[in-house]
Amino acid sequence: MSGEERRYEILQLLKTQTTPLSGAALAGQFHVSRQVIVQDIALMRAESYDILSTNRGYLIRQKGETDSFPKRVFFVRHTTEQVLEEFMAVLDFGGKILDVVVEHELYGQIRVDLMIESKQDAQDFYSKLLHSRDNPLKILTDDCHYHTIAAPSEKLLDLIAQELRRKGFLLE
């Protein structure tokens, strides 16, 4: 199979998925290395396909409910042990954590899609965080970071802000 054919097949798979596909799973399915998949994804993005890279794998961005939701960027600070508490504060008010962003002194803005949409997503992310040899991005900026949060209404975004403030996470 040529690279072009493989990328076409990967794209078809991503279009039918509602959950992320890991690079390792794609590599196994197409009998190539994970690095080849990373390169394929980069080439597809260069062709204007909106492919998200999450901690659970790759997704193609579909037009969905979150697209029409109001969004707000929150500047927060907390310990690694408080990550799950932060996520739950957002999810309890119907919010979704779309990304994490840090402002690095040397590299500038570093943004990673999270797509934490449920308590199960939050638990899974936190479990991976605790068992990973890697550190969260917030370590680069003394625990300070941003999240883009989407919620069904501005009122819910206000309640999320209030809860993050109450917990001492929101920096203003």
Per-region residue spans from a language model:
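Residue-level marker of alpha-helix boundaries and capping positions
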Residues: M1, L14, H31, R77-H78, ...
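Solvent-exposed alpha-helical segments within well-ordered globular domains of core cellular machineries
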Residues: Y8, Q12, Q39-A42, S127, ...
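Generic secondary-structure signature for well-ordered alpha-helical cores
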Residues: K15-T19, Q35, A46-Y49, D92, ...
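N-terminal helix-turn-helix
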Residues: P20-S53
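Mid-protein regulatory/catalytic core that forms ligand/cofactor-binding pockets
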Residues: S68-E172
